[in-house]
Amino acid sequence: MRLVVCLVFLASFALVCQGQVYKGGYTRPVPRPPFVRPLPGGPIGPYNGCPVSCRGISFSQARSCCSRLGRCCHVGKGYSG
């Protein structure tokens, strides 16, 4: 039984190495996500490009974060979402 399992594994590995399993032709590598430049005014939250704090950001940056992500700054309260 072990011999059969070993032979099946080796045969499937050989097919993958030869490229017989993938019939779609050349597959290019997955591109990296674009680099997000940090905004001035504080640390950056994960994957969103908006500062964690509302302090020190411009009105246009605050409006952009609010419209794109629903993270809206309120006077004296910080982010709402």
Swiss-Prot record:
Instruction: Name the InterPro entries on file.
Output: Penaeidin (IPR009226)
Recite the UniProt keywords alphabetically.
Amidation, Antibiotic, Antimicrobial, Chitin-binding, Disulfide bond, Fungicide, Pyrrolidone carboxylic acid, Signal
Chain positions found as Serine amide: 80
Q: Name one GO molecular function term.
A: chitin binding
Which biological process terms from the Gene Ontology are attached to this UniProt entry?
defense response to bacterium; defense response to fungus; killing of cells of another organism
Which cysteines are cross-linked by disulfides?
Answer: 50-65, 54-72, 66-73
Signal peptide position in this chain? 1-19
Q: Where found?
A: Cytoplasmic granule
Tell me yes or no: is Hydrolase among this UniProt entry's keywords: no
Q: Which family does it belong to?
A: Belongs to the penaeidin family.
- Please report the name of this protein according to its UniProt entry: Penaeidin-3j
What GO cellular component is one of the record's annotations?
A: cytoplasm
Query: What function does the entry list?
Result: Antibacterial and antifungal activity. Presents chitin-binding activity.
| Record PTM Pyrrolidone carboxylic acid, positions in chain | 20
Q: What is the lineage of its organism?
A: Eukaryota, Metazoa, Ecdysozoa, Arthropoda, Crustacea
